[in-house]
Amino acid sequence: ISVLYHEDGSFDRYLILDKNPDLVVVDTNVVAAAPLRMTVAGMGDALATYFEARSCAAAHGTNEHGGAPGHLALVAARACYDTLMECGIAAKRDLKKGRTSPAVERLIECNILLSGVGFESGGLALAHAIANGLTILPECKAMHGEAVAFGLAVQLRLERAPEFDQVLEFCQRVGLPTTLEELGLGEISDADLQSVADATFKNERNMANEQAKVTKQKLVQLMREA
């Protein structure tokens, strides 16, 4: 699966490919040398994997291929969340010092393999729909995973998820945004936020996978309150 965007950076669509890559090679040293913000953004994307797959399963929804989330996908998605809780903060600390470690190795596996299997086979829900909706704003300079982290905060608030406080604390400790202010959108107008809600609802499959149903008006309120 590939994600396509318009020239202006706004979300276009998911492109379903005929086959997966034959091989994925990830050099730990390359990841360790990359800007830390990129890896942290990857954590934000991975963090949503479990909660979106869980929502998709509860809503009897479908993944981007049109199938129901399988057991393996849900196991991988849960392992993704558990790995972040166990290793994410330590991995960021090590990467900030420019060194690799077992925690970094596990984080790379989580961000790339577990999250990839979990989201593609498990399905997406509100967190990604919001992240895609935010791309209509030229002033939103957040990386994809950062926008997903914000979307996840909104999703978990909507669902009244018991993990809400744990997820917010994790995001604060690693530096992932969970509020409009942290996204650099603290001054966003009501009209622009309504446009984000409109764009969010255009992600019809993702919205159908959200177990806690929401209106556009409620979504605007939740984004303001996040």
Over which residues does each language-model region extend?
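C-terminal charged capping/lid subdomain of soluble metabolic enzymes
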Residues: 161-226
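A short secondary-structure junction motif
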Residues: 50, 54-58, 87, 91, ...
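A glycine/threonine-rich phosphate-anchoring loop and its flanking beta-alpha core
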Residues: 1-72
